[in-house]
Amino acid sequence: GMSCGTHANSDKVLKSMRIVFADGTVLDTGDADSRNAFKQSHPEIIKGIEDIRDRVLADDELVKRIKHKYAIKNVTGLNIYPFVEHTDPFDIITHLMVGSEGTLGFASEFTMTTGHLYPYSSSAMLYFKDMREACECVVALKNSPVECAELLDKKSLASVNDTTGDNLTAILVRTSADTKEQLAANVAAMEKVLEGFNLYVQPKFTSDPEENAKYWAIRSGVFPVVAGTRPLGTTVIIEDIAFHIEDLPDATCDLAQMLQDHGYDDSCIYGHALEGNYHFIIAQSFKTEADVKQYRDLMSEITKLVVDKYDGSLKAEHGTGRNMAPFVEKEWGPKAFAVMKEVKHLLDPQNILNPGVIFNDDPDCFVKSFKPLPLTNEHIDKCMECGFCEVNCLSCGFTMSSRQRIVVQREIARLKATGEDDARLKRLQKQYVYYGNMTCAADGLCSTSCPMKINTGDLTHDLRNAAIKPNSFTHKVGDFCADNVPAIRSGIKLALLSLIHISEP
């Protein structure tokens, strides 16, 4: 969440895990019998983990490097912090899985500790004319009882229609406590820090639940709003970097200037400033070589800024993926990267789990194999394929999910436009009839969890309408029903009442 930082992230609260490895072996690290069985069946893995642990601990320079890198949020590459944090090989294996993105095994179950939920909290939106001063304020607040501090740059504020002022930077802060008295003391301590800064408006802390909800709705609304206003046919890319807190003012201003210099005038920067962790959003087209070059140049400069200048994290929360795979060794250095590769080979010697993710020998993999987003249907063109809709899709797991329907329809549209593979086009169109069309409930539940509020059912209705031939029997029945709704409704009611009457004893 907004306040987990590094002290309460998934690695810190993880207790045990049920893992399925590449060879099909199942290990439950929280079960003594499972651990003993794994020792007997895979002694080479246990010994390998212990050997890596001992070599890491014997290298003071590497230990220092690892601790420094994980002092801030960092998920670039594999999580090698367990080698200095834990001694038991099963604990190390458990925590190696965190952030591994399916490259080491499948986590089917896990046990985590819960955090304390404070009953009282107070929030305030702090506005600054200058981004640097906003960041300097965050640095100063770091030593106060602040729970979280979220930065929203001018584009972020504009996207959610904040009318406080023009070209402002905001910091949304929150503090929490077990008692009202402690909460008041926390607010007073934070207000004392704020006295040293030039705020655009007087800060107003509120503990009213409705007001608090409005503040945090603004923060939550940035990504879907910005993504929803991107030009059609472009991909929304949200990157995720982190700096050490003392570098925050300089690094934030450098990042903002870099995005502007590379032509990303509509980009926005927001995120967990208290942890030095920012997300920046860009709308990127990959249609031309110039588009690809623009993106390549930006990523090259980002790596120089984050790694060379500030020794930060190229990935703080979202995972390495393919986009940052070529830069893992650059960030970590050869020794740490060698440890990661050794772990990968130990747990997945045949490289069958998510190949190309985190570890990729192609230095240009981040500018290859782009997924096109052709204009397909006005109801779905804003889709960014995040998959949030799938939890409410009735056919997900049976045939296709709402996201998969959109992906397939985009591929059909692309094949129609390019004409490159007519056989594949016909196959997709034929298979979609059942998997995509007939099994779609078209009830719109998918839109309730979609950040863009996209109703894939509207797409299905369009496709079904298009499939009905004019003057066909189906078309005539549809026309008749549309022209005689009251009579049909009455007839259905009468039929239902008759059935009820017949079924009564």
Predicted regions and their residues:
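FAD-binding subdomain of flavoenzyme oxidoreductases
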Residues: G1-R132, N143, Q350-N360, D364-L375
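A mid-to-C-terminal "edge-of-domain" accessory segment
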Residues: G77, D88-P89, T94, V160-N161, ...
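C-terminal substrate-recognition/cap domain of FAD-linked oxidoreductases
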Residues: P82-F90, T94-D297, L305, Y310-S313, ...
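Short beta-alpha connecting loops at secondary-structure transitions
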Residues: Y120-A124, V236, F286-D291, R322-E331, ...
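Flexible glycine/proline-rich, aromatic-decorated loop/lid segments
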Residues: K155, S159, F223-V225, E275, ...
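Iron-sulfur-cluster electron-transfer modules
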Residues: G228-L232, G419-P505
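Non-ligating segments of multi-cofactor redox enzymes
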Residues: S313-L314, G321-K330, P334-L375, Q409, ...
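Iron-sulfur cluster-binding cysteine motifs and their immediate structural context
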Residues: I352-V357, F388-I412, T439-A466
